[in-house]
């Protein structure tokens, strides 16, 4: 029997949110679908989030929960129509239809807790790209070991671009994915945040966020020199240095003989 925490704003009992729970022997506690609810609520084996309504708010809640370093599986409950809105960046471990039967619910809960136990020793998820590292667990980003002082949205924007290196996103796409469906500001917001991000990356690394004219932005992966090319250059430099060293004694001897000849002719 597992300890389940159901986050919901519905005034219905848990068996109305997910009827199959009424046929299973798990211990279910209910709390408001808000981030602070976790502070006043004891830990759980699995957190269930009621996403049958208000998907933009629930998406933000799931991302917030994941950003706090949540150590237990996060399972989203949605209607069949809500499945189309769910993507990987929600930060959830699994998704359940509210009409799922008890056998399916039991299997998914068992798999979610099993994966958590198997992966319990894994380090927090970190995105590495060249000199840049983005730690989703601590919401921090480092460039050559230097911690970047980023706002929440600057971090989210950098993380999203770094997760998809080379892929071009329009301003509208970034606005939807980073700011959310419920944001009603203009795409100019994206330009402002990109400009601030580049300033914080510094002149040497501002090109990590590339502009695709008349389209949008992309994360540019730093190019690494080919091993063969690097070794060829090293060999050429080494040969040139050896030749210069071999030539130097000859030049010195010639200059000495020339000077001696000049003195004897004067005499």
UniProtKB/Swiss-Prot annotation:
Keywords in alphabetical order: Activator, DNA-binding, Phosphoprotein, Transcription, Transcription regulation, Two-component regulatory system
DNA-binding is among the record's keywords: yes
Pfam families reported for this sequence: GlnR_1st, Trans_reg_C
PROSITE patterns attached to this UniProt entry: OMPR_PHOB (PS51755)
UniProt feature, compositional bias: Low complexity: 252-267
Modified residues (4-aspartylphosphate): 50
Domain of life (superkingdom): Bacteria
CDD domains xrefs: trans_reg_C (cd00383)
Disulfide bond annotation, renumbered to this chain: none
Stretches with biased composition (Basic and acidic residues): 221-248
GO biological process terms on file: regulation of DNA-templated transcription
Biological role stated in the UniProt entry: Activates the transcription of the glnA gene.
Stated name of the protein: Transcriptional regulatory protein GlnR
Organism: Streptomyces coelicolor (strain ATCC BAA-471 / A3(2) / M145)
């Amino acid at each position: 029997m597992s300890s389940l925490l159901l986050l919901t704003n519905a005034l219905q009992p848990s068996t109305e949110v997910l009827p199959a729970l009424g046929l299973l022997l798990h211990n279910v506690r209910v709390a408001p679908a808000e981030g602070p609810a976790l502070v006043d609520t004891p830990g759980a084996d699995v957190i269930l989030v009621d996403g049958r309504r208000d998907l933009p708010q629930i998406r933000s809640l799931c991302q917030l929960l994941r950003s706090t370093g949540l150590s237990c599986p996060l399972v989203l409950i949605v209607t069949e129509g809500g499945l189309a809105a769910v993507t990987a960046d929600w930060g959830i471990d699994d998704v359940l239809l509210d009409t799922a039967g008890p056998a399916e619910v039991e299997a998914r809960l068992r798999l979610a807790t099993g994966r958590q136990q198997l992966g319990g020793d894994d380090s927090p998820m970190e995105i590495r790209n060249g000199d840049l590292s983005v730690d989703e667990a601590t919401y921090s980003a480092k460039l050559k070991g230097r911690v970047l002082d980023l706002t929440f949205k600057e971090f989210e924007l950098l993380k999203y671009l770094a997760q998809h290196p080379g892929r071009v996103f329009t301003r509208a796409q970034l606005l939807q994915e980073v700011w959310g469906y419920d944001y009603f500001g203009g795409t100019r917001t994206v330009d402002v945040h990109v400009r601030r991000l580049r300033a914080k990356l510094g002149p040497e690394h501002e090109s990590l966020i590339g502009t695709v004219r008349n389209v949008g932005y992309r994360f540019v992966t730093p190019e690494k020199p080919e091993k063969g090319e690097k070794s060829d250059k090293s060999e050429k430099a080494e040969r040139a240095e050896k030749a210069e060293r071999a030539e130097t004694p000859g030049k010195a001897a010639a200059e000495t003989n020339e000077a001696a000849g000049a003195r004897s002719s004067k005499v």
